[in-house]
Curated annotation (Swiss-Prot):
Protein's UniProt name: UDP-N-acetylmuramoylalanine--D-glutamate ligase
Superkingdom of origin: Bacteria
Keyword Cell division recorded: yes
Subcellular localization: Cytoplasm
GO cellular component entries: cytoplasm
Pfam families associated with the record: Mur_ligase_C (PF02875), Mur_ligase_M (PF08245)
Length: 458
């Protein structure tokens, strides 16, 4: 049951509130809390100089700042603590606050708790952003006022009083955001679950349990959309409290949405042809099937078809950059796991020269080698994981006698030059790293933008 936001306004007014992390989502949150009458202290590991103008702006607003080395040691004596999504609830600082009686929450939890509009929550190891965007496009096409947030779009909590009951709200939710989520989400979509973020989660089970929170607090009238091809998600119906619908790109029996003979179907009705979908690849067929099921009660088949035939995709997802000397370059920087890279490779009709590597999330790379070799003409590695990926391809050669040429470089510029030097007329070069970007770049967008800049300067 959605609660009246006036309750929150009364609760937060005059409270001594800590906000951990001065990032994209927390900057508007801090300003909003000040507006609601809270006494706010903002915490961040960066210095005032590193934060730039925002630190001065906060000082003018009366926000106390606790910055730099040891900043979490000073997180004590607060009535309310808004944590950053990646901060574990069992961290020493938060355990200390909880023992002191603090209410610990996050921007996303409070938003979902008080949001009047119907909430669609999208999670999964791969396909979250594209599926979230498709759901938003479908609802907008049908004429609904649609708000998009979570991991993408703009932070929504500060806009909560503008969102009406008839509005639709589509959220991309990460495992970090879901770990402490204990509120009802009207429509939950789980695209797939494969090993991911094992550098942050204690183990795979904790990661799975976090994902389950997207539907754990649903009631009988709510909806759960699951991937019937994924070994983990196909069994989630056993724990569901609401209605469950399934999608599959490989089988039709018992499926609520499926792909057959080049066409996509939802609840037995043909929606569109695969060849008419602008964004290519079977992973995008699955993203559409999931989205169609999520909005089936609100969106017409005509609107579904229109979006599929006009939506050109999201930046950094199998994004065509340019063709140089007969070689096509694609940016798939979003691919931060081996499974997402495999899905991207399947979108191409011929083997590609793959640029891969980056930050180590402690996931195995054998699937990339053993399942992807037919789609890889050569692989050029960079980043912290390059030796780990190289070892997976070496194992493939030793065990199966399958040789994939492996090259490596130190920088993105160097690997692009290596790929360019081995490419022939008609080849495809794609950046699809199978890893996060944090060893060399702030995020996958910065990595993708740098790649595009390099390619556009060839």
């Amino acid at each position: 049951m959605k609660r009246d936001f006036n309750e929150f306004k009364e609760f937060i007014k005059g409270k001594n509130v800590a906000v951990v992390g001065i990032g994209v989502s927390n900057i508007p949150l801090i300003k909003f809390l000040v507006k609601l009458g809270a006494k706010v202290t903002a915490f961040d590991m960066k210095s005032a100089e590193e934060l730039g103008g925002i630190s001065k702006e906060f000082e003018i607003l009366g926000v106390n700042l606790e910055l730099g080395k040891g900043y979490l040691d000073r997180l004590t004596g607060f009535e309310v603590v808004f944590k950053t999504p990646s901060m574990r609830i069992d961290s020493e600082a938060l355990v200390r606050c909880k023992n002191q009686g603090a209410y610990i929450t996050s921007e996303m939890e409070e938003f979902v708790r008080y949001c009047k509009g119907k909430v669609y929550g999208v999670t999964g190891s791969d396909g979250k952003t594209t599926t979230t965007t498709i759901v938003s496009k479908l609802l907008s096409q049908e004429g609904y006022k649609t708000w998009t947030g979570g991991n993408i779009g703009t932070p929504l909590f500060s806009n909560i009083e503008e969102i009406k009951e008839e509005d639709k709200v589509v959220l991309e939710l990460s495992s970090f955001q879901l770990m402490t989520m204990d509120v009802e989400i009207d429509v939950a979509i789980v695209t797939n679950i494969t090993p991911n973020h094992l550098d942050m989660h204690k183990d795979m089970q904790e990661y799975i349990d976090a994902k389950k929170n997207v539907f754990k607090y649903q009631r009988e009238n709510d909806l759960l959309v699951i991937n019937d091809e994924n070994e983990i998600t196909k069994n989630l119906d056993k724990e569901a409290k609401g209605k469950v619908v399934r999608f599959s790109s490989k089988k039709t029996a018992g499926e609520d949405a499926y792909y057959k003979d080049g066409k996509l179907y939802v609840h037995g009705k043909e929606v569109c042809k695969k060849d008419d979908i602008i964004i290519k690849g079977m992973h995008n067929v699955e993203n559409y099937l999931a989205a169609f099921l999520a909005v089936y009660d609100e969106v017409s088949i005509e609107s579904m078809k229109k979006v599929a035939e006009t939506f050109g995709g999201v930046h950094h997802r199998c994004e065509f950059i340019r063709e140089v000397d007969g070689v096509k370059y694609y940016n798939d920087s979003i691919a931060s796991t081996p499974t997402r890279t495999l899905a991207g490779l399947k979108a191409f009709e011929k083997p590609v020269i793959l640029l891969a590597g980056g930050y180590d999330k402690h996931v195995p790379f054998e699937p990339l080698a053993y399942e992807g070799y037919e789609k890889i003409k050569a692989i050029v590695l960079f980043g912290v994981t390059k030796e780990k990926i190289k070892a997976a391809f070496k194992r493939l050669e030793e065990e199966k006698g399958i040789h994939v040429p492996v090259y490596s470089g130190e920088s993105l510029e160097e690997v692009v030059n290596i790929a360019k030097s081995i490419a022939e007329n008609g080849d495809i070069i794609t950046l699809s790293p199978a890893c996060a970007s944090f060893d060399m770049f702030k995020n996958f967008e910065v990595r993708g933008d740098k790649f595009k800049e390099i390619v556009n300067n060839i």
